[in-house]
Amino acid sequence: MGPLQGDGGPALGGADVAPRLSPVRVWPRPQAPKEPALHPMGLSLPKEKGLILCLWSKFCRWFQRRESWAQSRDEQNLLQQKRIWESPLLLAAKDNDVQALNKLLKYEDCKVHQRGAMGETALHIAALYDNLEAAMVLMEAAPELVFEPMTSELYEGQTALHIAVVNQNMNLVRALLARRASVSARATGTAFRRSPCNLIYFGEHPLSFAACVNSEEIVRLLIEHGADIRAQDSLGNTVLHILILQPNKTFACQMYNLLLSYDRHGDHLQPLDLVPNHQGLTPFKLAGVEGNTVMFQHLMQKRKHTQWTYGPLTSTLYDLTEIDSSGDEQSLLELIITTKKREARQILDQTPVKELVSLKWKRYGRPYFCMLGAIYLLYIICFTMCCIYRPLKPRTNNRTSPRDNTLLQQKLLQEAYMTPKDDIRLVGELVTVIGAIIILLVEVPDIFRMGVTRFFGQTILGGPFHVLIITYAFMVLVTMVMRLISASGEVVPMSFALVLGWCNVMYFARGFQMLGPFTIMIQKMIFGDLMRFCWLMAVVILGFASAFYIIFQTEDPEELGHFYDYPMALFSTFELFLTIIDGPANYNVDLPFMYSITYAAFAIIATLLMLNLLIAMMGDTHWRVAHERDELWRAQIVATTVMLERKLPRCLWPRSGICGREYGLGDRWFLRVEDRQDLNRQRIQRYAQAFHTRGSEDLDKDSVEKLELGCPFSPHLSLPMPSVSRSTSRSSANWERLRQGTLRRDLRGIINRGLEDGESWEYQI
């Protein structure tokens, strides 16, 4: 061993420097150095910059960015390895060279607190590479290293305990806790935030790290040493919230149960599973928003109460807390329809959400929605009749152009309401204006409550239709103002209002399963396929219109006037593109030679290529929407039901379900669901499972117990063993098909609403 070298001295040789990735493998973009802004030509900008110079400097910095995320990550990894090689202490900690560490620590000049490129100490490196012996030597020499966090922006706040926990190094965790390592340290670096740039999200505390890697022993050990199971990270997420976001659903459910077993909440503390994050989401609501059906069903099992089991029938009470939109401003139903995650819509097909939505829609939602549609249809007819019979009078002034063929003009306000017919029209106009005001009073508060982006951008909520109806209401009010001041040109807002008002009738198609998905299909085609097609069409029209204008620029406009001036050339090319008109042909004169070549190319590109491209794009959109039409229609029904429930008074929309107060279940509301399972099908499943597991070499001993426990109507029955003659006479492949077929069949749910309204009839889903 040579003498101790400085930071720039040679490192201990012979060590393997193959890069080992740290626990979190996503690196942030390094901050740009704060240097004086430079002009692109290399000149410094003045200190007191104006608005234009400031914007120009920002544009230059944005344009001159050279480092990508991947490049930045690679550079920091290489820099970290280089720094380790340059430091004998860090290299010895990486290689678990105890002898070298002991020799280095004897020197007075040895800086035991020196840090690497990521702000890590030697103890962090030893924990990262699972070097227990090196970590013990470092902790004996400098016990304060246990409390030292990393200081880089990427891993800020991470201690050696975080690293040991995520690597599941139980011995090192025990050693760190024995030296009073902080169990409440928070790793707040950018690598630990929930971001699309990060591959993992384990929270900030060591306990959440241990829970996410499914280490029950470390979780118990941390809790015994005082780890707070109610600790929240910078997003307000507890360890239960973080478990909801993990990809391994099975382990997450097991760890969820373990953590709840340590929840010893008193009268002044809220239960752990009801603690919301900063967005107001409990773990249950977060599971619904994320579309985590496994965790959602797991949590629903904890909320249900089985009343009785009668053969294949099972009566179950499901707790509607946090699910029902009645009395909850942020219910699960509203969260699902407002989220952008498609997976969240799968929750609408889960029990009891599906049964609750169906009950509300068929009892209250559908009748009220049909009534609202009928009222709107009568309203728009009234507005149309008022527009058709608007006050007009013969034209009084003289014509100023031979092309002017106007015969009638708008009456003044004093002349518009003089006859009995005008009084009838006035009533219709008042109804129209009052209706427009009501529309604005209903729509505008929702914009502020939900936000502009969510309100207008969500297709399920009817975003484009909200734009139509609000614009229609404004056009009606503009028409009213122009009528009051006797301004000419009221036909412009009136025409827009008629088109928008009648187009909004399509919104009420969502009440029908056959027509509802088609409204979404139209929206996707208009704002998706058609918008992209319009950009291509604009490029083609601009190019060919310019060419046609140049070709006919020297010709007589009286003979070939389609492309005489440039605006006319653009409009004529647009008509040619849509095949509204044919190409200009006058056989009495000679056409330019380049016209034939240009028109042939235009016909091939526009008619044969681009129009068929649009048809293909729309066909693909139709295919995608058709495959999820049931899911989309169910989401539309939920959105419509929640909207009507919030708008209508409680006397017109009573709360659905059973109040638990009358039955000793507290103030919560429940929904009773009867599940029916075919007894023969259950037996076939057990036989098929027996054949499937009998031929397997690695038979799980617990599978028989799980199969028996999974049968709710006969838990005491043992697994039937098939006879040898039957097993030899039937192919195992047929049994496998039978097993798969039976498992794919969905159960039928029945809701008995007799406890709600005193009736004895059943409501079948």
From Swiss-Prot:
Top-level taxon: Eukaryota
Recorded topology in the membrane: Multi-pass membrane protein
UniProt catalytic activity: Ca(2+)(in) = Ca(2+)(out)
Modified residues (Phosphotyrosine): 201
Residue positions, PTM Phosphothreonine: 742
Region (Interaction with calmodulin) residue spans: 133-143, 731-751
Subcellular location field: Cell membrane
Main localization (coarse): membrane
Region (Interaction with S100A10): 638-642
One Gene Ontology molecular-function label: identical protein binding
Entry-listed glycosylation sites: 398
GO process terms (BP): calcium ion homeostasis; calcium ion import across plasma membrane; calcium ion transmembrane transport; calcium ion transport; parathyroid hormone secretion; regulation of calcium ion-dependent exocytosis; response to calcium ion
Membrane spanning stretches: 368-388, 426-448, 464-483, 490-509, 530-552, 597-617
Annotated function: Calcium selective cation channel that mediates Ca(2+) uptake in various tissues, including the intestine. Important for normal Ca(2+) ion homeostasis in the body, including bone and skin. The channel is activated by low internal calcium level, probably including intracellular calcium store depletion, and the current exhibits an inward rectification. Inactivation includes both a rapid Ca(2+)-dependent and a slower Ca(2+)-calmodulin-dependent mechanism; the latter may be regulated by phosphorylation. In vitro, is slowly inhibited by Mg(2+) in a voltage-independent manner.
Entry's disease: Hyperparathyroidism, transient neonatal: An autosomal recessive disease characterized by impaired transplacental maternal-fetal transport of calcium, high serum PTH levels and signs of metabolic bone disease in the neonatal period. Skeletal anomalies include generalized osteopenia, narrow chest, short ribs with multiple healing fractures, and bowing or fractures of long bones. Affected individuals experience postnatal respiratory and feeding difficulties. The condition improves within a short time after birth once calcium is provided orally.
Descriptive protein name: Transient receptor potential cation channel subfamily V member 6
Classification lineage: Eukaryota, Metazoa, Chordata, Craniata, Vertebrata
